[in-house]
């Protein structure tokens, strides 16, 4: 499995507009926003070098992000960009790494993603994102 880079850091926020204002005050600019109905979140991506910060606001109290914010706030996940998501999942399964997603699903912007259980990654929720093929 070839890792290309950290794609983004996902940060759970209770209010997207307030969070954007705080980051803009630091000099960040919003690169893209997405409504992800399947995950019940709104997101904003802020470029940071070759990576991004992803701010995530829940749109429903039943979303994973809403439940996360009830317990804590802040860093939610680290996203690793990979060449071949199916191959990466196969390799992780072969090594006994617990997965939250056995098959890829669509993430923000329509890209293919899958999550690794924090128990298999030292307590960190990892998102694997497949690099767009050109």
Per-range role (PLM):
Residues 6-7, 26, 31-40, 59-76, ...:
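A cross-kingdom feature marking solvent-exposed beta-strand/loop segments within repeated
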Residues 35, 44-49, 53-54, 80, ...:
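Vicinal oxygen chelate
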Residues 19-23, 92:
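Conserved active-site tyrosine of GNAT-family acetyltransferases
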């Amino acid at each position: 499995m070839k890792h290309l880079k950290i794609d983004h850091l996902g940060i759970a926020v209770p209010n997207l507009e307030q969070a954007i204002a705080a980051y803009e005050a630091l000099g960040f600019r919003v690169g893209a926003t997405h409504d992800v109905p399947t995950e019940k979140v709104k997101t904003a991506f802020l470029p940071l070098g070759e990576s991004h910060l992803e701010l995530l606001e829940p749109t429903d109290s039943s979303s994973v992000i809403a439940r996360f914010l009830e317990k804590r706030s802040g860093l939610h996940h680290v996203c690793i960009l990979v060449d071949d998501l199916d191959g990466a999942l196969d390799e992780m399964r072969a090594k006994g790494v617990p997965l939250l997603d056995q098959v890829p699903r669509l993430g923000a912007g329509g890209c293919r993603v899958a999550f690794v259980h924090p128990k298999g990654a030292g307590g960190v929720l990892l998102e694997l994102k497949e690099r767009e093929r050109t």
